[in-house]
Swiss-Prot record:
It is found in: Cell inner membrane. Belongs to the ATPase B chain family. F(1)F(0) ATP synthase produces ATP from ADP in the presence of a proton or sodium gradient. F-type ATPases consist of two structural domains, F(1) containing the extramembraneous catalytic core and F(0) containing the membrane proton channel, linked together by a central stalk and a peripheral stalk. During catalysis, ATP synthesis in the catalytic domain of F(1) is coupled via a rotary mechanism of the central stalk subunits to proton translocation. Component of the F(0) channel, it forms part of the peripheral stalk, linking F(1) to F(0). This is ATP synthase subunit b. It is a single-pass membrane protein. NCBIfam families: PRK14475.1 (NF011045). F-type ATPases have 2 components, F(1) - the catalytic core - and F(0) - the membrane proton channel. F(1) has five subunits: alpha(3), beta(3), gamma(1), delta(1), epsilon(1). F(0) has three main subunits: a(1), b(2) and c(10-14). The alpha and beta chains form an alternating ring which encloses part of the gamma chain. F(1) is attached to F(0) by a central stalk formed by the gamma and epsilon chains, while a peripheral stalk is formed by the delta and b chains. Disulfide bonds: none annotated. The chain crosses the membrane at residues 8-28. Its main location: membrane. One of its GO terms (cellular component) is plasma membrane. One of its GO terms (molecular function) is proton-transporting ATP synthase activity, rotational mechanism.
Length: 167
């Protein structure tokens, strides 16, 4: 048996090492390309994922900024609406107070007018009663004076008209 086929001989191991080396060189170049291509594909995939993550992060940041701006605008509008409502409440309160004071003043004037009318009516009634009483007294006094004397029909008529003229 030749020496390079006997595993006990050094030539065998030198030949085996040479074949392994040549296999690595020959197949390693092809394997290197395949490994490099696989690594490049993996790197491209990772880079695409990183780019997508960066794009999503930027989009999320823009959305967050937009939402924060909308929230700030909504808060500003709410404060503005609250201030407007407070002003309107003060205006309504002032208007209601003015209307109430006006109604109270109008009712006070009406009450004063009613009191003045009642006073005038009472004074007129007292005056009428006094005139009626005076007419009756005058009629009574004249009737007593004229009873002894001859009663003149003209005097009787004048006494009868006296009550209506005093009123």
């Amino acid at each position: 048996m030749p020496a390079f086929l006997n595993p006990a001989e050094a030539e065998f191991w030198v030949g085996a090492g040479l074949l392994i080396f040549l296999g690595i060189v020959f197949f390693g170049a092809k394997a290197h390309k395949a490994i490099a291509a696989a690594l490049d594909a993996k790197a491209a995939s990772i880079q695409a994922n990183l780019d997508e993550a960066a794009r999503i992060r930027d989009e999320a940041r823009r959305l967050l900024e937009g939402l924060q701006a909308e929230r700030a605008e909504a808060e500003r509008q709410a404060k503005e609406m609250l201030a407007t409502a407070e002003v309107q409440v003060r205006q309504f309160e002032a208007e209601a107070k003015a209307k109430l004071e006006e109604a109270i003043e109008r009712r006070r004037r009406m009450a004063e007018q009613k009191i003045a009318t009642a006073e005038a009516q009472a004074a007129a009634e007292v005056k009428a009663a006094a005139a009626e009483l005076a007419a009756q007294m005058a009629e009574s006094v004249l009737a007593q004076r004229l009873t002894g004397a001859k009663a003149d029909p003209l005097v009787d008529r004048a006494i009868g008209q006296l009550a209506s003229k005093l009123q």
